[in-house]
């Protein structure tokens, strides 16, 4: 049976502010990327999310970001390499500590927002992120967008890298995500989200808005939890994939 992973960015509430339906999404996805306090999340949210993920049998991942709570980590920043490397290690350590206290451990790392977007195009920035991951725990899986610099740099550094595609985001001919400001960049229709994923899996690569196909391996599909109807879309996608013969597994199982 063909294997595929579904992942979601979770734990992005903080304080009195609530984001997403994490408890419901955890019944659908197989891997959770948990905010580590820099773009969202706080110690209590992180702990509660870890507990829910462990109870659901979902693999735990860190979702480190630039220090940008107000901008939700989506604003590009320029940080000195040493500063950024330390910031990523700090976030990994925070979540790993909480996971250990709850009897779990991290399986993967997925950079968030602008940090991910910039690292996907800038090999030097990607190398800084990869150094941080290797320094913290070189057994961690790096979950990186397929065909990105981050993916390539991670592989060259000897990390185990999982290639990610996005269910609800349109692609450019360069295999990058279309800017959120562009029409059609974020896909909201449930049927189109499912069709978009199936097109890519059937084609064996990323399918751009233009129809261009860029061949690549694909290990994981990201379903965003902060879009309207996210849970319904994720549930329908999971059901459709299962009906078409795909086994939904955690990231650590993708290489088995």
UniProtKB/Swiss-Prot annotation:
Entry superkingdom: Bacteria
Pfam family, one: LamB_YcsF
Stated role: Catalyzes the cleavage of 5-oxoproline to form L-glutamate coupled to the hydrolysis of ATP to ADP and inorganic phosphate.
Originating gene: pxpA
Root EC class: hydrolase
GO terms, molecular function: 5-oxoprolinase (ATP-hydrolyzing) activity; ATP binding
EC id: 3.5.2.9
Gene3D superfamilies referenced in this protein's UniProt entry, alphabetically: Glycoside hydrolase/deacetylase
UniProt GO BP: carbohydrate metabolic process
HAMAP family, A to Z: PxpA
Subunit note: Forms a complex composed of PxpA, PxpB and PxpC.
Nucleotide-binding recorded as keyword: yes
Keywords: ATP-binding, Hydrolase, Nucleotide-binding
Keyword Ribosomal protein on entry: no
Organism: Azoarcus sp. (strain BH72)
Record-stated family: Belongs to the LamB/PxpA family.
Catalytic activity as recorded in UniProt: 5-oxo-L-proline + ATP + 2 H2O = L-glutamate + ADP + phosphate + H(+)
Name this protein carries in UniProt: 5-oxoprolinase subunit A
